[in-house]
Amino acid sequence: LELKNIYKTFNPGTINEKRALNGLNLKLNEGDFVTVIGGNGAGKSTMLNAVAGTWPVDEGQILIDNIDVTKLSEHKRATYLGRVFQDPMTGTAATMGIEENLALAKRRGKSRLLRSGITKAEREEYKELLKILGLGLEDRLTSKVGLLSGGQRQALTLLMATLQKPKLLLLDEPAAGMNPQETEE
């Protein structure tokens, strides 16, 4: 990931104008693990949203694997990214089952072909992956995600974000919805 001279201002030209990113430069190499620390309103989430394409930047350039993604839409950038949001309600489809959410995550960035739903092999794979979490979700594959606790949902979101082995994993307070025991696990 490389961020070159990134600027982002909210509500420009108004009394509520707020410069969130001011000439941000950052270069990360494959395998780097970075934690961004700052107070409320420091621009941490804004930076992640800019990288993900949720909010376009005012100026600057965003490169992933030396590919300029600055003008790419959020859904096109998703090919490169895995993401866990601060809010455990974001990143999953509440009215769909656990296995359906996992299937969507597994197919992220792939061509959508007409085919049957979730295969038996996929279901078994999902059970094994969920078992690792130790939350009992492997026995609730058809349960609606909206019925899960915040911590269960956040753990599921983390699993979904890593199913495709993304080039870049964006974590915005990934343990926010988890209780201390779930966070430790």
Residue ranges: model-predicted function:
Residues 14-18, 56, 68-82, 90, ...:
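ABC ATPase NBD coupling module
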Residues 37-39:
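The feature captures the beta-strand-to-loop junction immediately N-terminal to the Walker
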Residues 60-68:
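Conserved ABC transporter NBD signature motif
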Residues 87, 95-111:
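Q-loop/switch helix immediately C-terminal to the Walker
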Residues 161-167:
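A short, proline-enriched helix->beta-strand linker immediately N-terminal to the Walker B motif
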Residues 169-173:
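Catalytic Walker B motif of ABC-type/P-loop ATPase nucleotide-binding domains
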